[in-house]
């Protein structure tokens, strides 16, 4: 993430304090070494739903079949950074969770403490919304809805400051803070499509950045966009950040290969940002399927026929895609500092049928949205609530056992050549 000193702890990858970590080997997974991979290169994973899944009874198992803390499993296999989303107040007026992990600050603290225990830094992803913020919606938190703009900006600053202080007080190793999630022309109820919209968006981002600098002066500040295939839009984001003098370190992009174009384009777009504005760049979200099958009785984002050329829906295909994204950021992108995999631990809640899983999603918030989210987001979550849509893109099977493909995060550093590697395992 830029400055080497910031990564001193993070680069002690796969080695929780006081523990030796055995080498990772594989007889079936073919991984070409990523040359010139810096020791402090970020190999991260979003795990925001883990506590909700564990509340449902989900357990995680290492490659020897032993039940193990999932954060220890991730650390052993090369993950050196954990990402967690934070929503302002993801509960309805009766205290029922909206789902998607019910990702409030308490959830972030619980995850952050476990990540820190196993030698991993935390990226805090503030959505500045009560539920999902993405290119389709950037809804303002309910408690800010009746505020004028100046009061909202002040509240965003104070909220960011106070939430970060809670994480620091809990002993969490915060390495990076993301101000907004996939803020493509909108943020916290503001839109670039109206006069003065960009100015307001950038001032709000600056308010969040100011809080980070005060509470976590050594942490990196990241901004996050998506759809890198829309090259002109990325140039617009970069120009506006520069014009309004936003204080940030990292320009982050989502990259889902089945939506977002080629790796060549990704490298070119991010390199241009890095060269023009002197910023670090990274992939904040990526993922790929190891199977076309669904395991929780709720339709997946991608399935049969959705694969990208050269990457079959197998564990080998999943690992190869991840390896190539890492290589693209490390060797073909100016200023590339890392890659985060999105929700590689989000698996089935464990029910034997849809009805059992639905009850778990509603009670513990382990699906993408509960029916209670309709109070806040009636048009999307209120219509399509349900389970996990990415369980076939996790690094654990439906029963919580680590896949062979998870080893890719370790094997990219040394390589693991398997002749005639099967694409079907």
Language model feature labels by segment:
Residues 7-10:
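C-terminal motif of bacterial Sec signal peptides marking the signal peptidase cleavage site
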Residues 12-14:
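Bacterial signal peptide processing site
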Residues 21-110, 114-121, 127-155, 252, ...:
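N-terminal substrate-binding region of glycoside hydrolase catalytic domains
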Residues 29, 33, 272, 291-307, ...:
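Aromatic-rich peripheral "rim/lid" segments of glycoside hydrolase catalytic domains that contact
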Residues 45, 74, 115, 125, ...:
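Conserved, mostly hydrophobic/aromatic
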Residues 48-50, 87-89, 127-131, 179-184, ...:
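Active-site beta-loop-alpha junctions enriched in small/polar residues
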Residues 64, 68-71, 214-220, 232-308, ...:
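Glycoside hydrolase catalytic-domain groove-lining segments
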Residues 97-98, 102-109, 133-240, 246, ...:
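Active-site cleft segment of glycoside hydrolase catalytic domains centered on the general acid/base Glu
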